Amino acid sequence: MSSAQAEDEQDYETPSCYELQKHFTHGGVAYTHVNEVWPGVYIGNEETARDRYKLQTLGITHILNAAEGEWNSVDTGAEYYKDMQIHYYGVTAEDTPTFNISQYFYSAAEYIQQTLSDPHNKLLLHCVMGRSRSATLFLAFLMLQQRMSLLQAVEQLAHRRHICPNWGFLKQLRELDTHLQEERRRTHT
């Protein structure tokens, strides 16, 4: 790491939720059913998750459903993809500001990282709209596995997909960012 990068990391402050939301509206990406947001990673909505032909066309080998559950969910499950040879991982998360999605940050990031360890794999990360729960988990992946700050992760994703994590999820991502930045500062001093 260069001294300029180290200085930038030391000067970095986690942006407010309001500041982060400004990046969502300035990304300039129109809302679509699915977007490739990282090599081999697609974020999409329920329609994409249920479109077996589209999944085959995209070459999807793995699915992370960030909307399992009984309320505002996508109830596909592993059975839905059984005959397609798609590896399925589901997260029971509600898209409400009070829901603790941070409990899935590390496990989802690990699943994404394991999926991407084979360059032939392609992952669809989805929720109902592909804008809040799935985006939040992918932002956590970028922060945890790619060592991005929250701001870097938001900028990376917002230029590839129209996202809008709810206010509570943004607060949890901010807490993760603060924790990771403190941890990185400790290891560099």
From Swiss-Prot:
Kindly list the places in or outside the cell where this protein is found, as annotated in its UniProt entry: Cytoplasm; Nucleus
Q: Which CDD domains match?
A: DUPD1
**Alphabetical keyword list:** Cytoplasm, Hydrolase, Nucleus, Protein phosphatase
Keyword hit for Secreted? no
Q: Which GO terms describe its molecular function?
A: MAP kinase phosphatase activity; protein serine/threonine phosphatase activity; protein tyrosine phosphatase activity; protein tyrosine/serine/threonine phosphatase activity
Residue span, Tyrosine-protein phosphatase domain? 33-182
Note the InterPro entries from the entry: Atypical_DUSP_subfamA, Dual-sp_phosphatase_cat-dom, Prot-tyrosine_phosphatase-like, Tyr_Pase_AS, Tyr_Pase_dom, TYR_PHOSPHATASE_DUAL_dom
Q: Which family does it belong to?
A: Belongs to the protein-tyrosine phosphatase family. Non-receptor class dual specificity subfamily.
What is the protein name for this chain? Dual specificity phosphatase 29
